[in-house]
Amino acid sequence: MRFRGLDLNLLVALDALMTERKLTAAARRINLSQPAMSAAIARLRTYFGDELFSMQGRELIPTPRAEALAPAVRDALLHIQLSVIAWDPLNPAQSDRRFRIILSDFMILVFFARIVERVAREAPGVSFELLPLDDDPHELLRRGDVDFLIFPDVFMSSAHPKAKLFDEALVCVGCPTNKKLLGNISFETYMSMGHVAAQFGREMKPSVEQWLLLEHGFNRRIELVVPGFTLIPRLLSGTNRIATLPLRLVKYFEQTIPLRIVTSPLPPLFFTEAIQWPALHNTDPGNIWLREILLQEASRIDPQSDTC
């Protein structure tokens, strides 16, 4: 199909190239052979009068013209999908759909494991691709490259719908051999002790507890930074360091790692875990189905009684 001399199939190829940044992967994404994808690039270059991509090693580097075209092309394809091509109804028992979800290691352990278990029973052909926290998850959401974000609602965009999962408390924790934790600790002691903290993505963005503490004006002495919450409990063992962690994560690790929760001198710290999905997928039957499962399972999580 052509529109003003442009084969619209070439826009699908351009979108795949911008997403994958590798020729073979882009060709595989839209079920083309590598020679056919190379031919599509040549035709795109002719139509737009621009090189569009250069090769650096095996990676395709887009030109400014390609970067400028990419958002409009992706939005146009998404609107065609939603406005012209109807969403397929979902039969969970027979579906082979794959959902891509960005979430933290903490949420995989304490929440998403129960989703995997339930879906395995109700929709055995459905699969998941669980992705680490990205430097720009909202761009992935806008492009429809992920089905859900699952993380604290304070980090979520106002441009897409979202729903609350549950509230989470943050607690102060350390190794039971740490003599400074035998009783209540003062604010000065808390601030002077070495802390272990998680940061995420290539830009090392702060985790929710660090964000909340900075919002209160508390700048801790962080001695060890790791790329995820689940690494922290083991790294506290045998040291005098402390961490401020989600309570459910501490309860999970208490079964295998000696940990001590201490009364914090800080005001109680809480955050809300939530889900967010692309606005353009709001009426997608598959998205609605999984959304309902996520909310149902969240409602079954025991409320917390402990606080910092």
Curated annotation (Swiss-Prot):
Q: Which GO terms describe its molecular function?
A: DNA-binding transcription activator activity; transcription cis-regulatory region binding
InterPro entries, alphabetized? LysR-type_TF (IPR050389), LysR_subst-bd (IPR005119), NodD_PBP2 (IPR037416), Tscrpt_reg_HTH_LysR (IPR000847), WH-like_DNA-bd_sf (IPR036388), WH_DNA-bd_sf (IPR036390)
Q: What SUPFAM superfamilies does the entry give?
A: Periplasmic binding protein-like II, Winged helix' DNA-binding domain
Q: Which residues bind DNA?
A: 23-42
User: PROSITE patterns under this entry?
Assistant: HTH_LYSR (PS50931)
GO CC terms of this entry: protein-DNA complex
Q: Which domain of life is it from?
A: Bacteria
- Locate the HTH lysR-type domain: which residues? 6-63
Q: Tell me which UniProt keywords the record has, alphabetically.
A: Activator, DNA-binding, Nodulation, Plasmid, Repressor, Transcription, Transcription regulation
Q: Which residues form a coiled coil?
A: none
Q: Which family does it belong to?
A: Belongs to the LysR transcriptional regulatory family.
Q: What else is known?
A: There are at least three nodD genes in R.meliloti. They differ in their specificity of interaction with different flavonoids and, consequently, contribute to the nodulation of various plant host species to different extents.
| Physiological role | NodD regulates the expression of the nodABCFE genes which encode other nodulation proteins. NodD is also a negative regulator of its own expression. Binds flavonoids as inducers.
Name the chain's protein.
Nodulation protein D 1
Q: Which gene encodes it?
A: nodD1
